[in-house]
């Protein structure tokens, strides 16, 4: 991936591992090695959470479930520390196919909040008495200082019964999902999904993000590039919410925050 010289720090913001996501095809360590070789400065591990395609048994007690869920992150962090790739924690929350990327919190915080469990559309766990909703999620994550990004809001797939938008309950929009537009993508490959996401963000004046949504070592090299190195998720949140200088890429093309083609 050829970087723009003024924006030398590239981050993957949408990343699934075989340890924690059923759809993951490569181990966290192998994916970290691939990202380092591709020129990334860091990654956010965002495995599928309770209401999505998680690999961890939902019948486990909550704290044990969180430990299992975090195995992909822990493995990625261990390998990242060994080879010099920054690895940050996040997750992808699912609500009957509508998904959100969560940043800025920790596994320890997650263990203390069993109310993160959502109702499940697939019938593999008993219904909850008080499941998390999109509205409750926004309040809970914000209270803790985290950030909520609507992932691929216009993707059309059988696992997504309907397109649902929640502009008042998100901090931003994933306007560039590399699986939609990168020529190497073999799934969800429909650029109009990104075009609609850009329009949605502009209509509601929401910040935009970019990520590859990768599940294996077959990288697209999508993500976001910054002028400075991010010290942690807090720097990422600050940059997005304050619309600090950064570029977005699907691994094939570069865009500014208004959606203009840079390169």
Predicted segment positions?
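A metal-dependent hydrolase metal-coordination microenvironment
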Residues: 2-135, 139, 175-203, 215-218
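Distinct, well-ordered alpha-helical segments
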Residues: 98-104, 109, 155-167
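Aromatic-lined carbohydrate-recognition surfaces of secreted/lumenal glycan-active proteins
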Residues: 90-92, 142-158
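Short low-complexity, flexible loop/linker segments enriched in glycine and/or proline
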Residues: 57-61, 103-104, 163-167, 222-227
């Amino acid at each position: 991936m050829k970087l723009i010289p003024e924006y030398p720090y590239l981050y993957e913001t949408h990343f699934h591992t075989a340890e924690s996501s059923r759809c993951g095809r490569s181990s966290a360590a192998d994916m970290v090695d691939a990202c380092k070789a591709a020129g990334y400065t860091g990654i956010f591990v965002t495995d599928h959470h309770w209401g999505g395609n998680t690999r961890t048994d939902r019948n486990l007690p909550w704290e044990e479930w969180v430990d299992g869920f975090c195995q992909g992150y822990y493995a990625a962090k261990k390998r990242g520390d060994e080879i010099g790739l920054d690895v940050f924690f996040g997750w992808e929350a699912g609500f009957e196919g509508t998904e959100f990327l969560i940043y800025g919190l920790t596994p320890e915080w997650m263990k203390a909040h069993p109310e993160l469990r959502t109702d499940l559309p697939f019938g593999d766990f008993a219904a909850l008495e008080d499941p998390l909703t999109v509205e409750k999620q926004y309040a809970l994550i914000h209270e803790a200082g985290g950030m909520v990004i609507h992932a691929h809001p216009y993707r059309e797939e059988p696992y997504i019964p309907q397109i649902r938008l929640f502009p008042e309950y998100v901090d931003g929009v994933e306007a560039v999902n590399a699986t939609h537009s990168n020529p190497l993508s073999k799934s969800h490959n429909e650029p109009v999904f990104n075009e609609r996401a850009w329009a949605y963000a502009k209509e509601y004046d929401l910040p935009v993000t970019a990520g590859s949504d990768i599940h294996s070592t077959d990288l697209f090299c999508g993500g976001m590039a910054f002028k400075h190195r991010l010290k942690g998720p807090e720097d990422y949140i600050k940059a997005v919410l304050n619309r600090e200088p950064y570029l977005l890429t699907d691994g094939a093309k570069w865009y500014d925050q208004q959606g203009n083609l840079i390169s």
